[in-house]
């Protein structure tokens, strides 16, 4: 009765593959909406404001990853404990864990907001951001960083809902927010001529709506109706949450910092190369959207079944996820080889000679990533399974491997094969991390014998 009323899902019984697919589909649809928004945003900025504005947005991609990765990592870590309590039907500790997660998220979001605004200019200068775009990049960041509290709140509320098997509410929030974002993008950028500032303002408004929507839905779930007592200090609760959350934060930061080093190298190739790299990175989310969705489904599935003590179901679920991931990655790769150049051309405008050069750079990078996409999908399966098991340390170690491989490839390969070497940095990072995660998962599962 409670599950029907609150629209949450018990994943400790039923077909593992079916449960994972049904959970992942709304997340995929939400990611599609988000990526369509990102593509429209890129098209509007690139077509209306020009190649320099497009490059200005691309120059801050990895810096935004680092900053938003803090709240995303924390809430992902917190949701692991929430899913385990839900799987064990320990609703009292579920409520306490949620209340303490709220408090920690608010405190850390405030700190990140202050630090990010304080050091944004310094970081862009240190990255040698091209002089003709650094002003636009900084303006965009200043506005986006004002939305950090809204982003953190949305991540927290959406993670809590997913931990209890509800992936439909975040989908609804994402659909409405994406429509709102695109509408405001067109109004602010094309209509009012606000350029990158208009794109940033539209994003902050839409993200704020998503947070409010998910919070209102979460409040209607009876088993997590919080009282003042739930916010009272509970022995070891904050420590357990941070033990799960901090490694995920460091994992995200390490990956993001590696990306910043790559961005530093790319900035030295000029703004046309930056624009081409940016165009492909805007499609990157489309490439990995299903992997992210499967990842969230696996974390919830594994966490709930671990809480219920059903280890065999965990193995079956991960095997099903591997097959799903392989098939999905092959389909997406084929689509990128066939239609990737046409999609990329939508993002680029300007002088014919410049646009052809940017398009050639972008499609070469896209082709390399598409060929090895299956590695990224396996990475998500193993990392998410370990996180669901409560192991956030080895995913952090794999993040360090990504960091080392990405930087090494970015700094070394261009000396041997020219600028194209930078495109293989991402592949090297995926491969190193996947090997570590694969070994760690099977070693950990062997212990359950």
Residue ranges of model-derived segments:
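Transmembrane helical elements of multi-pass membrane transporters/channels
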Residues: 22-41, 143, 154, 177, ...
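Transmembrane alpha-helix boundary and packing residues in multipass membrane permease domains
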Residues: 27, 31, 43, 80, ...
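Small-residue-rich hydrophobic transmembrane alpha-helices
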Residues: 54-114, 151-170, 276-340, 376-398
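Hydrophobic transmembrane alpha-helices of multi-pass small-molecule transporters
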Residues: 66, 181-185, 211-215, 286-289, ...
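Short runs within selected transmembrane alpha-helices of multi-pass transporters and secretion channels
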Residues: 75, 143-162, 170-178, 199-212, ...
């Amino acid at each position: 009765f409670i599950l029907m009323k609150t629209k949450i899902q018990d994943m400790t019984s039923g077909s593992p593959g079916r449960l994972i697919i049904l959970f992942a589909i709304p997340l995929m649809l939400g990611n599609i909406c988000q990526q369509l928004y990102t593509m429209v945003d890129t098209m509007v900025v690139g077509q209306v404001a020009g190649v320099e504005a497009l490059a200005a947005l691309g120059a801050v991609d990895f810096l935004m990853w680092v900053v938003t990765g803090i709240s995303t990592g924390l809430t992902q870590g917190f949701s692991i404990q929430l899913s385990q309590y839900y799987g064990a039907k320990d609703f009292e500790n579920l409520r306490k864990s949620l209340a303490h997660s709220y408090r920690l998220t608010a405190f850390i979001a405030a700190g990140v907001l202050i630090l990010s605004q304080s050091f944004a200019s310094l970081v862009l200068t240190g990255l040698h951001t091209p002089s003709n775009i650094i002003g636009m990049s900084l303006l965009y960041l200043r506005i986006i960083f004002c939305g950090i509290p809204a982003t953190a709140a949305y991540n927290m509320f959406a993670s809590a809902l997913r931990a209890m098997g509800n992936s439909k509410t975040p989908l609804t929030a994402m659909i409405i927010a994406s429509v709102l974002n695109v509408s405001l993008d067109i109004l602010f950028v094309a209509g009012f001529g606000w350029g990158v500032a208009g794109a940033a303002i539209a994003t902050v408004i839409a993200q704020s709506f998503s947070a409010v929507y998910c919070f209102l839905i979460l409040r209607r779930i009876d088993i997590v109706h919080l009282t003042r007592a739930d916010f009272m200090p509970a022995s070891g609760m904050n420590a357990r949450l941070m033990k799960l959350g901090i490694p995920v934060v460091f994992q995200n930061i390490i990956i993001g910092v590696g990306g910043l080093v790559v961005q530093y190298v790319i900035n030295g190739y000029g703004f046309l190369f930056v624009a081409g790299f940016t165009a492909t990175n805007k499609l990157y989310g489309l490439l990995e959207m299903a992997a992210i969705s499967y990842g969230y489904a696996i974390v919830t599935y594994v966490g709930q079944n671990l809480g219920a003590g059903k280890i065999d179901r965990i193995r079956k679920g991960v095997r099903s996820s591997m097959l799903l991931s392989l098939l999905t990655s092959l389909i997406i790769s084929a689509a990128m080889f066939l239609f990737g150049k046409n999609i990329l051309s939508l993002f680029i405008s300007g002088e014919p000679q410049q646009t052809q050069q940017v398009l050639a750079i972008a499609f070469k990078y896209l082709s390399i990533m598409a060929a090895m996409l299956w590695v990224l999908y396996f990475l998500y399966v193993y990392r998410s399974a370990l996180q669901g098991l409560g192991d956030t340390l080895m995913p952090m170690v794999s993040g360090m491997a990504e960091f080392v491989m990405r930087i090494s490839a970015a700094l070394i390969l261009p000396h041997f094969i020219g600028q194209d070497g930078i495109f293989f940095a991402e592949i090297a990072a995926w491969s190193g991390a996947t090997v570590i995660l694969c070994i760690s998962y099977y070693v950990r599962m062997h212990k359950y014998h």
